[in-house]
Amino acid sequence: MKVVASVVLVLGLISFFCNKKLNDAYFLRIIHESKEYLKSVQMYNTYRFDEKGKPKYIEAISNNSGEENFLVIIGESQNRKHMSAYGYSRDTTPWLAVQRTKENFVIMKNGYACNTLTMLALSQALTEKSQYNHKTLDKSYSLIDIAKAAGFKTYWISNQAQYGSYNTPITLIANSADEKIWLNSDSSASSSYDEKILPALSMVKGKGKKVIFIHLYGNHWEYNNRYPQEKYGIFDNSNYNGKVVDLKKLNAYDNSMYYNDCITEKIFQYAKQNWHVSNIVYFSDHGESVLNDNKHIPGKYDDDMGTVPVYFYFSDEYIKAHPDIVKRTKNNEGVYFTNDMMYNALIDLWGIKTPHYDVKENFLSDEYGYGAGKLLILDKIKI
């Protein structure tokens, strides 16, 4: 019954998102793909646990010596074209703009989302499943699975709604973490500011190597609910001269971008001072079409929905211990990639050896096998 209800819900959403009349063949294909995807989600835990409910063995070995901590920050609906660190006219990301000039910082120039919907984008970015390997979600291990198998304690801190334990693949993936901290029980219309993340950071403690995931609410619609208005509402009609469908929405989106920059700075500072992180990775699930007011609706796809920020911080200790990885990252800062390849890049950065890794899908590798002309978004649109 839950599966049937989920299929109906997904079909309803797809029909809404696709701003066109569906013909019979297309409608039948959507039904088939939705059923297969939901079946895959339903079978997700079966692949990971035996009949007694114990986790199955996963081959994964950490090559790192000592106590190394890694942080992954996941943004939401963030279009890099609205970030001053990427050349945007408004000063929306002053902190990041300064960081990009530092030797221990690398900003990737050509990162793209694999999908415009969070559920579908992150279920690939965080697992073996990608647009290129045709694996199903239920037969794909996640970054949390691999990190735990390699001896890391894992944390998931989220300012996004958890919904039900079995309602989304993101919740399924997150629930495999050793520690889960859910900070937002409301809907996307709520003003659950990302500053709620900051006091929760102190809950990550103790010795031993760790991988911490932080999932922000970021720049999700409605944009004016993503930041405290009085302090961060710095952009108005007087400081934008370009073409836009709705200037009020643009101002709110750019204000949310500025707020995101401030919150990310504070997370970075805390992580470096208190967790002594070796590496921090930031990426967004998908972009946002703000100028055309199409948000991230697949049926109205434009390039702004695909362009996302991806950047890396390396500690001095990490640079000394892994100069080859840092060099490769800098050499590849201009390569084109989609964020369903984050899984393989992060395994590389964390120094984990596992058969559940594909060097061809690691955009930080010298053996990277993709690039402009070979990449997809939404499984069909070429980049």
Q: Where are these predicted regions, by residue range?
A:
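Active-site-proximal alpha/beta segments of enzymes that process anionic O-linked groups
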Residues: 6, 10-72, 77-240, 307, ...
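Short beta-strand segments
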Residues: 156-158, 212-218, 254-257, 279-284, ...
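Metal-dependent active-site segment of extracytoplasmic phospho-/sulfohydrolases and closely related
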Residues: 71, 259-298, 343
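A long, amphipathic alpha-helix that forms part
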Residues: 56, 199, 237-280, 312-314, ...
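Histidine-centered active-site microenvironments of extracellular/periplasmic hydrolases
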Residues: 87-91, 276-277, 283-322, 359
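Polar, surface-exposed loop/tail segments
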Residues: 326-331, 351-383
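A short beta-strand-to-alpha-helix junction
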Residues: 134-139, 247-258, 300-306, 319-346, ...
